[in-house]
Amino acid sequence: MSTETDVLVLGGAGVDTIVYVPELPLPFADSYMVPRIEMRAGQTGDFVALGLSALGLRTHHLDMIGADHAGDLIRALHRDRGIPLTEVPLPGGTKRAVNLVGPDGRRLSLYDDSRSHEADRLPEETVRALAAVSRHAHVSITYPCAFALPLLREAGLTVSTDLHNWDGTNPYHEPFAHEADVVFVSTTALADPERTMRQIAERGRARVVVATAGAEGAYLLADGEITHVPVVTPPAPVIDSNGAGDAFASGFLLGWLSGEPAARCARYGAIAGAFACTVPATGTDSIGRDALLARLAELDAAAAGAGA
């Protein structure tokens, strides 16, 4: 099959309003003076697309976007970064969120759930046409991407997804968890991460499950075994954790689509995620392939020296 796209990213296009707050959780008060409030394009699908493209993978983004100013910001972001964007009209308006960012880089995200409607769909003919020329699909959990999963399977694509802060029981996430070959999930809301990881693999198609754990690194389930993925020291001070999970997924997929072992892919992801933590919430910079591979070589050399 001839392909012109390495990764087709579905969903996750939106705009965030970034509010820097003095602390999290934010104590109740009638008002606060904050350093600044800024709006910028970039939610999970956008960041994965940006990360993949920066790593040299041919990337195409498909999602529903509104005919509004927020939608214009998304269109401009993709145009400026040279990432093809196929947009389907979203009658309820472009997806939006407010991110409260604390001094330590942690964030609290508030998502506007009024934008999507039950009848929203990505047209089957559009999904099929883009899938026919793609190697792999990364599917965001935003509505209505779940309806596209069978079409991607019919096209023979491998699939990845990020369940974010799934609690392991919410049924909304299950189609994504069970239809993907590579599953990313945060440990934040999981009572028993190992149990959830194994259930994902047992009940679905996943060959690899990665549970990211912030400053603790990540956990990788591959070939029936769970191993710890050490955190990578960021190349600069940590400013904001926003987008770190998306960067991890992008780095991992670079390795996976290159045929690297899962453990090696996870190192790619850890390096990309560490870089993302040094980027302000208002920014959209991603690590490039050369920088990632150079950092990987440094880590390999350090490990070899320690074992000598």
Predicted segments with their positions:
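Glycine-rich phosphate/adenosyl-contacting loop at the front of the ribokinase-like
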Residues: 1-62, 307-308
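A glycine-rich beta-to-alpha transition motif near the start of alpha/beta enzyme domains, typified by
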Residues: 58-86
